Amino acid sequence: MTRYDDLPYRTCVGMMLLNAEGLVFIGRRLGGIEHVDETHVWQMPQGGVDPGEDPWTAAKRELYEETSVRSVEKLGEIADWLIYDIPRTVAGRSWKGRYRGQRQKWYAVRFTGDDSEIDVVSPGGGHKAEFISWRWEPMQNLPDLIVPFKRPVYERVVKEFAALAKDAAKVSGGG
């Protein structure tokens, strides 16, 4: 059996989807072993990078597979890969015990479509739903809504993309 400290990080992407008012899409996750309470069940779309796939392509694919959204314009990305560890108590059950956490590349995009495009119950490509509901949320609230072990990543994402929320609203006429 591989020791927790020797496990690799799963290569993933995350997507901050901003609407015309500069608010961020968050989805309420379906139940999972990593959830600690009902407050920390919200997150932005994220997912794994397939072998040979570049991160930006993976981010667009994951966004579509989780939300049905394709109408986006890239605003920015975080140069660094952000890393988090999952708690040791769930590491053996999460991802079949193959990873100790995730290594994520984060992107910010402007949503150029209409809210009717968003479908988390029957998402794009016939993929299994990961969210049961969704809403637009002020960016500064995001770290308090995510499971605690992901909070440092969300704090960094919010810090890096804070100006983009204002820009998204200005460009779209929302601010």
Curated annotation (Swiss-Prot):
UniProt GO MF annotations: bis(5'-adenosyl)-pentaphosphatase activity; guanosine-3',5'-bis(diphosphate) 3'-diphosphatase activity
Q: Which UniProt keywords apply?
A: Hydrolase
Say if the entry is tagged with keyword Cell membrane.
no
One Pfam family name from the record?
NUDIX
Entry cofactors: a divalent metal cation
Motif (Nudix box) positions are 47-68
Per the record, the GO terms for biological process are: nucleoside phosphate metabolic process; ribose phosphate metabolic process
Q: What is its EC number?
A: 3.6.1.-
Q: Does the keyword DNA-binding apply?
A: no
Q: Which residues form the Nudix hydrolase domain?
A: 8-159
This molecule's function is given as:
Accelerates the degradation of transcripts by removing pyrophosphate from the 5'-end of triphosphorylated RNA, leading to a more labile monophosphorylated state that can stimulate subsequent ribonuclease cleavage.
Similarity comment: family membership: Belongs to the Nudix hydrolase family. RppH subfamily.
What is this protein called in UniProt? RNA pyrophosphohydrolase
Question: Which species does the entry assign this protein to?
Answer: Rhodopseudomonas palustris (strain BisB18)
Q: Which gene encodes it?
A: rppH
